[in-house]
Amino acid sequence: MAYQVLARKWRPKTFADLVGQEHVVKALRNALDEGRLHHAYLLTGTRGVGKTTIARILAKSLNCENAVHGEPCGQCESCTQIDSGRYVDLLEIDAASNTGIDNIREVLENAQYAPTAGKYKVYIIDEVHMLSKSAFNAMLKTLEEPPEHVKFILATTDPHKVPITVLSRCLQFVLRNMTTQQVAEHLAHVLDRENVPYQPQALQLLGRASAGSMRDALSLLDQAIAM
């Protein structure tokens, strides 16, 4: 079996698995539990703090067949297909590679049609600030008058580059950097599960070196294990 980097292998699949971001998790769980769903969410924060991970978990919760208190079950067909990247009603777009209006127009035209399998069509647009001005303008009309069956989850490291007209139509969550202690404790958990010995002081060093990014911390841990 090919080696899978730790950041991918140990990516959280439920809200309960997440490290940190309790303020975001609590708000999303409450909204899901009470059915107070916004049509567009914007997740902001530095790299590696959980924006895309939370977006995927939220996508699962929105379409999970057995969600309890906003937590996806992880077992139903919707959850397993989202985890494997095969869910027809979830589209992930990297705006850094798809900046133009043609890319977004195709998405928006598709959004008008009802979901194939789930309750909602979910569009995750990563690094949304990279979209062109014309692409933002095209997206704005859909954000103003969204179909009932569509949810947008936008993620960015640079919200200041997102037009205010788009920001004002999204429910915004600011993700915080991880503390050194949060990182060190999670690295210890991963190493225990991987049956790799470690020194606690070394994990503290990795936690500080990661500058609050869990993904960077796990990448550094991969390098340390290889040495």
Question: Where do the protein language model's features map onto the residues?
Answer:
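Short, polar/flexible loop-turn hinges at active-site or ligand-entry regions and domain interfaces
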Residues: 66, 194-195
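Short hydrophobic/aromatic segments of transmembrane alpha-helices and their interfaces
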Residues: 7-8, 186, 199
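C-terminal helical "lid" of AAA+/P-loop NTPase domains
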Residues: 123, 188-192, 202-209, 215-227
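P-loop/Walker A NTP-binding region and its immediately flanking N-terminal helices
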Residues: 1-172, 182
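Non-transmembrane, interaction-prone segments in cytosolic or luminal domains
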Residues: 64, 119, 149-150, 179, ...
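Conserved AAA+ ATPase "SRH/arginine-finger" region at the nucleotide-binding site
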Residues: 94, 172-184, 195-197, 208
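Short, solvent-exposed loop/helix junctions and linker helices
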Residues: 98, 177, 211-214
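A conserved short alpha-helical segment within the catalytic HATPase_c
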Residues: 108, 184, 188-191
